[in-house]
């Protein structure tokens, strides 16, 4: 008999034979009957056994979280809360759990995050925890489908590189045979090379690595980056793609996971597009109205972003950032080269992602290298692609974990990461 997922039991008829597999979440042995709560990735169901000597002997010493195979019949006349249960006929123990559990799965005992991450394998069995990753998967799938619908193709670029994408020192070194190499911060350089190759619209979903010694609730040293690059486009085109991608991801998450999220007290609405736009200089004026002094060329502090974010419902763009705050590949504004054709997507005070129109002229690119005091020799493979017909192009990179954290209203990015890598954690 083929396995039936618990979430599909309602599609069957009363008295249909079923075979379910999963974890024993809870167990109650009464005088004449035993009640089991079985769980698989799709949900839970109550299983009822009439007590026989064999059943009682098997169940009375069976620990929670043991893995079972149960055969029985659908009972749609059940008085259980769900109105459906399985009348058990046989049970096979596939794997017996040890006692005690390192973490409770259903008991209302709240472990701290460090303890949970140290025992992540069992923490992920909790419905409120696993629902985060179901939601994250749906967000990513919605974004992927949208990008495919817009003519983007998915690509995969190297994660072991010889040069820093951003030109900085925040890199993890690795030994690559006889050469020094690094884990890539971003697929930026390779995305741009593909514009020269004529691919025109590409996106990538993959790991990115930042050797930054921060230890905050919003940063990871390894994260999943969703990156796009598009030819014959500017920063405005990139913003339109980004806001629609974010909306599509949230929309798909609500369609696929809305019920589970509501059961966990998370209510989400689809954001309205277009997202509001405000320039960097307009942000300075907002701060000055609050009596704050701010110098052009400085980055905004968390407190300053909180003040700016109070003017917006949720998502908004800050545009036209100073050239001094942007990487070498960012296109300066034609009318005012002290600012750039760039943007940050914000959610209130939290930065979601950055993007820009890129430099496509090789002479301007070399000028930007010199302004940033970068070693041109390290980027020869990249510069070469600009000499033989590089089209105007733009793009962005979006951290999946941070987006999920923001959308679900969570307080720590580690909640949206299966096995976080931060300043102190490389296990498990």
From Swiss-Prot:
A GO term, aspect molecular function: RNA binding
Needed cofactors: Mg(2+)
Keyword rRNA processing attributed: no
Entry keyword annotation includes Repeat: no
Cellular location(s): Cytoplasm
Domain of life assignment: Archaea
HAMAP family documented for this protein: Asp_tRNA_synth_type2
Major enzyme class: ligase
Annotated stretches, region: Aspartate: 188-191
Protein name according to UniProt: Aspartate--tRNA(Asp) ligase
One Gene Ontology CC term in the entry: cytosol
Major subcellular location class: cytoplasm
Function in brief: Catalyzes the attachment of L-aspartate to tRNA(Asp) in a two-step reaction: L-aspartate is first activated by ATP to form Asp-AMP and then transferred to the acceptor end of tRNA(Asp).
Keyword terms: Aminoacyl-tRNA synthetase, ATP-binding, Cytoplasm, Ligase, Magnesium, Metal-binding, Nucleotide-binding, Protein biosynthesis
Residues annotated as binding Mg(2+) 2: 351, 354
Cofactor note: Binds 3 Mg(2+) cations per subunit. The strongest magnesium site (Mg1) is bound to the beta- and gamma-phosphates of ATP and four water molecules complete its coordination sphere.
Site (Important for tRNA discrimination): 81
PROSITE patterns in alphabetical order: AA_TRNA_LIGASE_II
Classification via NCBIfam families: aspS_nondisc, PRK05159.1
One GO term of the biological process aspect: aspartyl-tRNA aminoacylation
Family: Belongs to the class-II aminoacyl-tRNA synthetase family. Type 2 subfamily.
EC number: 6.1.1.12
Annotated binding of ATP, by residue: 210-212, 218-220, 351, 399-402
CDD domains (UniProt xref): AsxRS_core
Pfam families assigned: tRNA-synt_2, tRNA_anti-codon
